[in-house]
From Swiss-Prot:
One of its GO terms (molecular function) is protein serine kinase activity. This is Serine/threonine-protein kinase tousled-like 1. Residues 1-22, 35-72, 95-120, 172-292, 320-402, 538-576 are annotated as: Disordered. Residues 651-928 form the Protein kinase domain. Belongs to the protein kinase superfamily. Ser/Thr protein kinase family. It is found in: Nucleus. Residues 10-21 have a biased composition (Gly residues). The gene is tlk-1. Autophosphorylates in vitro. Phosphorylation on Ser-634 by air-2 enhances catalytic activity. The active site is at D781 (proton acceptor). It holds the Pfam family Pkinase. Essential for appropriate transcription during embryonic development. May act during transcription elongation to activate the RNA polymerase II large subunit (ama-1) by phosphorylating the Ser-2 residues of the C-terminal domain 7-residue repeats. Does not phosphorylate histone H3. The modification Phosphoserine is found at S634. Residues 42-52, 233-244, 320-341, 365-381, 552-572 have a biased composition (Polar residues).
């Protein structure tokens, strides 16, 4: 159906049957009559195949009548267009529906610019909304007949007034938004065109020259066709394009039919009122496929292309025409004349090219669909004059044809794709089966994964429960053992000292028995010593010769064991003042026997004393274990993690390993990795000052950063770091079973040189790793308590831990020898720190701090004591300046130590750090060479000395021989 929108009422004609043509006027029910009525211009279509513009004429009722050609389709009848501005804000107009004989009531937007706005058929379709599918009555127009009560008419006018205000505000807002969007698209298009011209400037110039040549050829033929051109209007309007181009109809009558010379006037009074019945097309009247209109290819109900799609099609068509000039004349195939080709300009400026792409919305045939003209459309049509009211804007004729043709191509392409879909049905079904198989496999894998996850969670819960049960049993056993050993070994008892209470250690009955045995051994030793002294006094005069004595004297001496008194006197004075008798001499054999008995008793006492000392030492070890367990159990019961807490749903806390000043170490189990770990929990005291808190956190974070970057077999690994609360956090470390070296030395006091050499060799290996890094690390707190023994004794591997006081030597490699400033002076363990750390102000330190610590540890392992300040506390060491005055180390006579071990200790304990060896020199020391290599080197040196002596002796003999000659 072809329609032309004018400011007022629009009536559309139905189809015409056979060769006869009927003209009728579709009158809409008028609610506003009286003085507001105006002359209604009428446009009438004759139904011919011409693409001429409508001819405007005067009707008897004062309406303007115009005849319009809509093409040789055989389905379009005469159409009369009636225009008036009396309807106010809301106007209704009929429109043909999908059925040829059915009219659709449309709602038109209010006119713009005082009723002077004109719209193209495509734009008009956007501005209308279908109201119903019922046919409307065909009646004559009579201004004197009122069809509504005045009160109802007043209410209707008020509603229309409010609706008009709302529509005006709404459309103004929509126009502003569309104008903004249009300007944005225009700017983007200008940028793209500028880039396009820059990239393809030579090609564009060549393409522009070709249309100029064609225009010159056409200009020669223009005078011949000027008379025919004057009789035709612009055939590229939306009216002609809607009638011929979209239908793609070939010309059947040998060209364009002649335009009627006089308009056929029609009046509303000559037309009788009648109804249009809904009747479907018969098979005889069915339109062939090649003669169908574009509206028959569109889908009803919102399935047609949108305005943005049409604009995109127009943009694509423009690029295709610009790239291929041969496709431009294709617009004239469907009933167009040569005037269209003459009006085509070979070259358009930028403004015309931008205006040619004004947005067009595809009319929808569905019910209750409304189209709104874009600001671009209103701008074009409002700028035209009234004389060219039936023509499209300049340069828009071909664009409308291209638009309709592109829509036709899109709909035909969709039809071809829909026909090709059954051919690919097998492939689609196959792909669907594959997708279903994959979906089923994914579901199976997800179910298996969820099942495995549930099993894993159940296993974790089982492991957790078993570990808790085992730990509870172990805790109970330790408590029972501690309670049983306390009477025998001892325990802590709270005693009062002045106004304070303190825990004091009290020994058990085992130590009391040890003391009794010691007293008995000492008493027996004293008795044997006195008897031995008396025996020496009775020693015979001639040892080896038997003395001559009477038999009676010998028998008396044997019986009494003493010599007779020489001062025996019967007088009373002699009885009062009696002289002690001299010890009688005993026989030689008796003397030898008594002397042998006393010697054996002394040896027996010595053995008992050794056994007693060993038992006492063993009891001391038990006491250390017992005291340690008592403290550990007390700290464990007072800790907040004694309830088998699960940190971060991963680390199960089992039992406390030890507690320091501001941290505690727990043995835990990692249920994710199934391994035992050590969790070091750092506590920040709430009562500390902010400066102290910041300092502690700084050291803890530095320890974490340093420790996490280390990976060596002789260094404890750090696995994780996690936050517990606002005042505590935890570092997860590698768990090392056994004890530390400090605990082992307390039990054994000293170890052999071989065992000490093995431990020091592993420590030096770890220090070499720390110093080979790009930023060397100083441990600064190396001591026996931070050397862990994996097997619990000195015959196994060791690991270094506790990097809380570590330092990083940043900067260039040349600055590492100068050292870094000591920021934590008087921190650490004083017995193992070098003299430079006690100098005020704080000096610069290097990695040789750890070298001094190695020397002290090696000395303590061999000799059982520290080389400096062994019996002093740390406070006394500071008061007496013990370490500052430690300029030379001395070695006890026992035990015997090799010269290589003593030289190693001297190199480590040099007072000046410049004279002290570094870790790389210690690693190459002869102490760490294999024993066979040392013996070979010693043998080689001895052989060299012998050869030198022999050469010297040979030279001396030669000189002696020469002198004799």
């Amino acid at each position: 159906m072809s329609m032309l929108s004018m400011d007022g009422i629009v009536a559309g004609g139905g189809s015409s049957s056979g060769g006869g043509e009927r003209s009728f006027v579709l009158e809409q029910k008028m609610f506003n009559t009286g003085p507001q009525n105006k002359a209604l211009p009428t446009v009438q279509s004759s139904g011919s195949s011409s693409n001429h513009a409508p001819i405007v004429g005067e009707s008897p009722l004062g309406t303007v009548s115009s005849t319009m050609a809509t093409g040789d389709t055989g389905r379009v009848g005469n159409v009369t267009y009636m225009s008036s501005g009396m309807l106010g804000a809301t106007q209704f107009m009929p429109q043909n529906s999908s059925h040829p004989s059915t009219s659709v009531m449309m709602q038109q937007v209010p006119p713009q610019n005082g009723g002077a706005t004109r719209s193209s058929p495509t734009e008009m379709q956007q501005c209308m909304q279908a109201m119903s599918e019922d046919s409307i009555e065909m009646r004559d127009y009579n201004s004197g007949v009122h069809h509504m009560h005045p009160h109802q008419m007043q209410m209707q006018q008020q509603q229309q007034h409010h609706q008009q205000q709302y529509n005006m505000s709404y459309h103004n807002h929509q126009q502003q938004m569309q104008q903004m969007h249009y300007h944005q698209q225009q700017q983007q298009y200008q940028q793209q065109q500028a880039q396009h011209h820059q990239m393809y400037a030579p090609q564009i110039q060549q393409q522009q020259q070709q249309p100029q040549q064609q225009s010159q050829q056409q200009s020669a033929q223009q005078p011949q066709q000027s008379s025919a051109a004057l009789q035709h209007v612009n055939e590229s309007s939306n009216l002609s394009s809607a009638g011929s181009i979209s239908d793609r109809e070939p010309e059947q009558h040998g060209g364009t039919p002649q335009r009627p010379t006089a308009p056929q006037s029609s009046t509303a009074t000559d037309k009788k009122t009648r109804k249009r019945r809904k009747a479907g097309p018969t098979e005889d009247q069915a339109t062939p496929k090649q003669e169908r209109k574009i509206t028959e290819f569109m889908k009803v109900g919102g399935e047609v292309a949108s305005g943005n799609s049409v604009a995109r099609c127009l943009l694509t068509e423009y690029h295709q025409n610009q790239g291929s000039p041969k496709r431009q004349p294709a617009v004239q195939q469907n009933g167009s004349n040569s005037y269209d080709s003459q009006q085509q300009q070979p070259q358009m400026n930028q403004h015309e090219m931008q205006n040619s792409y004004w947005g067009v919305a595809t009319p929808s045939l569905g019910v209750n669909n409304r189209g709104t003209p874009t600001p671009t459309q209103q701008q074009h049509y409002s700028s035209d004059s009234n004389s060219n009211s039936n023509q499209s804007p300049p340069g828009q004729g071909n664009q409308s044809g291209r638009m309709v043709r592109t829509i036709d191509e899109e709909t035909q392409t969709d039809s071809s794709l829909s026909q090709a879909n059954p051919q690919n049905a097998d492939e689609v079904a196959k792909m669907n089966r594959i997708i279903e198989d994959h979906r089923r496999q994914i579901e199976e894998l997800n179910s298996k994964n969820s099942l495995e996850r549930r099993k894993n969670e159940a296993s974790k819960e089982t492991i957790k429960r078993l570990l808790i049960d085992k730990n509870q049993i172990e805790r109970k056993a330790l408590r029972d053992k501690t309670a049983a050993d306390s009477p025998r070994i001892g325990c802590f008892k709270t005693t009062r000292t002045g106004d304070s209470f303190r825990d004091q250690w009290v020994d058990g009955w085992a130590f009391a028995e040890m003391d009794k045995k010691t007293e008995q051994i000492n008493a027996e030793r004293n008795e044997i010593a006195s008897a031995s002294a008396l025996l020496k006094k009775r020693k015979p005069l001639g040892i080896g010769k038997e003395p001559k004595r009477p038999q009676a004297v010998n028998s008396q001496n044997d019986s009494n064991g003493m010599q007779p008194s020489t001062s025996s006197n019967t007088n009373g004075d002699d009885a009062i003042f009696r002289r002690p008798e001299e010890p009688k001499e005993i026989q030689y054999q008796e003397y030898i026997e008594l002397d042998e008995i006393y010697k054996l008793r002394r040896e027996h006492l010595r053995k008992e004393e050794t056994d007693l000392s060993m038992e006492k030492e063993r009891l001391e070890k038990e006491k250390q274990h017992h005291v340690r367990e008592l403290k550990r159990a007390s700290n464990e019961s007072a800790s907040q993690f004694n309830d088998h807490r699960l940190l971060h749903k991963r680390y199960l806390m089992l039992n406390l390993l030890g507690k320091g000043g501001f941290s505690e170490v727990w043995k835990a189990f990692d249920i994710e990795e199934n391994r035992y770990v050590a969790c070091k929990i750092h506590h920040v005291n709430k009562d500390w000052k902010e400066e102290k808190k910041a300092n502690y956190v700084k050291h803890a974070m530095r320890e974490k950063d340093i420790h996490k970057s280390l990976d060596h077999c002789r260094i404890v690994k750090q696995y994780d770091l996690l936050t517990i609360d606002n005042h505590s956090f935890c570092t997860v470390l590698e768990y090392v079973p056994g004890n530390d070296l400090d605990f082992y030395l307390k039990q054994n006091r000293s170890i052999s040189e071989k065992e000490a050499r093995s431990i020091i060799m592993q420590v030096v290996s770890a220090l070499v790793y720390l110093n080979e890094k790009s930023t060397p690390i100083i441990h600064y707190d190396l001591k026996p308590a931070n050397i862990l023994l994996e097997s619990g004794n000195t015959s196994g591997a060791i690991k270094i831990t506790d990097f809380g006081l570590s330092k990083i030597m940043e900067g260039e490699s040349d600055d590492h020898d100068l050292g870094i400033e000591l920021t934590s002076q008087f921190a650490g363990t004083y017995w193992y720190l070098p003299p430079e750390t006690f100098i005020v102000p704080p000096p610069k330190i290097t990695c040789k701090v750890d070298v001094w610590s190695i020397g002290v540890i090696f000395y303590q392992c061999i000799y059982g004591k520290k080389p400096f300040g062994n019996d002093l506390t740390q406070q006394k060491i500071l008061e007496y300046n013990t370490i500052i005055n430690a300029r030379e180390v001395s070695f006890p006579s026992k035990p015997q130590v090799s010269s290589a071990a003593q030289d190693f200790i001297r190199r480590c304990l040099q007072y000046r750090k410049e004279d002290r060896a570094d870790v790389f020199e210690l690693a190459k020391h002869e102490l760490f060479r294999p024993r066979g290599a040392i013996r070979a080197s010693v043998a080689g040196s001895l052989l060299l000395v012998i050869i030198t002596l022999c050469q010297h002796s040979n030279r001396s003999e030669d000189r002696l021989c020469v002198s004799n000659v």
